[in-house]
Each structure stands twice: as structure tokens, then as C-alpha cells.
Amino acid sequence: SLYIPFWNKTVPVSEPLYVIFAAFVIVGTVNSVNLTDGVDGLAASTTMPVCIFFAVISMLWGERFLSLGVFASGIAGGLLGFLIYNFHPAKVFMGDTGSLFLGGAVAALAFAYDMPLILVTLGIMYIIEALSDIIQVGYFKLTHGKRVFKMSPFHHHLEMGGWTGHKWKETQIVALFAGVTVLFAVLSFIGVFHRFGV
């Protein structure tokens, strides 16, 4: 079965269909987080609120998910320490190894809590990054060279001046992405709150 956030219900899903769905979500999340790692501190500051979300709900769910909460807290704490050296101008870089791990960890946590659909809101910035890249490539091929964005994924579009011509600084982009993620983490918490019977 598949849990539907905000509706607080589960719908039956066949095992083959669930396997296909899980593969799509895991691969999509891993690659989306990897795309987000294009500006100093961006992937880490966007993923930290996501991990804090999973840590908080583990406390509401009791001992059953305590180990998952410890895992999520460990990643959040590690990212906090990492960000000291990864904020602009970065001295240490995450690279594909780090961003792919974060994407895998986020997807794994969502499935371990049996709420993968929460990534629609919780991972909103990952989705925007991935969609901007897909739209850019698709539109470029369909129009033989025209672009929707100045550069993709979306954080590079902002760096290049976006649609307004105002070029965003790396620190501004990080603040925007992290802030939006925090807001949607709160929204996600509201969406699953009733599941814990509190």
C-alpha cells in the first residue's frame, strides 16, 4: 500500500507497480540531489532541513523508528559541520560521491518511513532543479536551439540573471533554496502529523 500525505490514507498498490514506482523515486531523487550540487553549500543546506524533518517525526513515532531518527540526525549534524567549510567560498567540496549519497539517503528514509510521496513537498527544490533541466533539454531539442532558462538547472539560471537580468549571488541562491525547503518541510510535517495520532 502507498501512504498519501495530507489525506492520511493508504491506497492499495500491487507489488510490481510499487517496485517500478520505488525505482523511479529512488533514481529520480538521487539524480535530483546531484543536480542541486552546483553552488557552494547548496546541496548540503537544502538537504539538512529534509533530514531534520525525518529526525523530528522519528521522535513522534516512538522507538519503532528511533534508529532512523539517529541516522537522519547524524546526516543533518554531519552536513552542519560540512557546511562550515562548504559555504561560499568553499574550501571543501561534496562532489558526486557526497551528493549521490545524500540523494540515496533521502530516498531511503522516505521509503523506510513508508511515506515516499512526502518527497513531492519535502523535496520541492530537488524537483524544481530536475524539472528545469528536463524542460531545458526538451525545449532545446524541440525548438532546435531555443532555451527556456539561461542555463540549467535552475540555480544556474538565477546565477546568470534569470528572466529579470538580476544576477543572484551564490549565498542568495543558497538562502532561497534553504528557506523554501524549510517552509516545505513544515508543510510536509503538517501533511503527515495525523499519522502519529498526536
Description of each model-found segment:
Residues 17-198:
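Alpha-helical transmembrane segments
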Residues 4-16:
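Short aromatic-rich membrane-water interface segments that cap or initiate transmembrane helices
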